[in-house]
Amino acid sequence: MNDQFSAAQHQLDALGLRCPEPVMMVRKSVRRMNDGETLLIIADDPATTRDIPSFCEFMDHTLIASQTESTPYQYLIKKGL
């Protein structure tokens, strides 16, 4: 696992979930976080490759890193900009 991913303060396992569940879970998790905290999302739904970056842009969060070449996909987001 990339050092960036392993340093996440929170983790969300969305394996086996299909759209729209992963993004709904991300939204719920982020709401409980403080600004500046990080969340590692692990997912295997191909729709997350589009949905999570769009969610970050729409909700003004930062997508720090992503790994979408093979499953499980990994996304590291920071709450807020």
UniProtKB/Swiss-Prot annotation:
Annotated GO MF terms: sulfur carrier activity
Signal peptide start-end: none
Keywords from the named record: Cytoplasm
Localization per Swiss-Prot or TrEMBL: Cytoplasm
Gene Ontology cellular component terms for the protein in this record: cytoplasm
InterPro entries registered for this protein in UniProt: Sulphur_carrier_TusA (IPR022931), TusA-like (IPR001455), TusA-like_sf (IPR036868)
Domain of life: Bacteria
Keyword Lipid metabolism found: no
Residues at the catalytic site: 19 (cysteine persulfide intermediate)
Keyword rRNA processing: no
BP GO terms, sorted: tRNA wobble position uridine thiolation
Function noted in UniProt: Sulfur carrier protein which probably makes part of a sulfur-relay system.
PANTHER family documented for this protein: SULFUR CARRIER PROTEIN TUSA, SULFUR CARRIER PROTEIN YEDF-RELATED
Family per similarity comment: Belongs to the sulfur carrier protein TusA family.
Entry protein name: Sulfur carrier protein TusA
Organism: Shewanella halifaxensis (strain HAW-EB4)
Lineage: Bacteria, Pseudomonadati, Pseudomonadota, Gammaproteobacteria, Alteromonadales
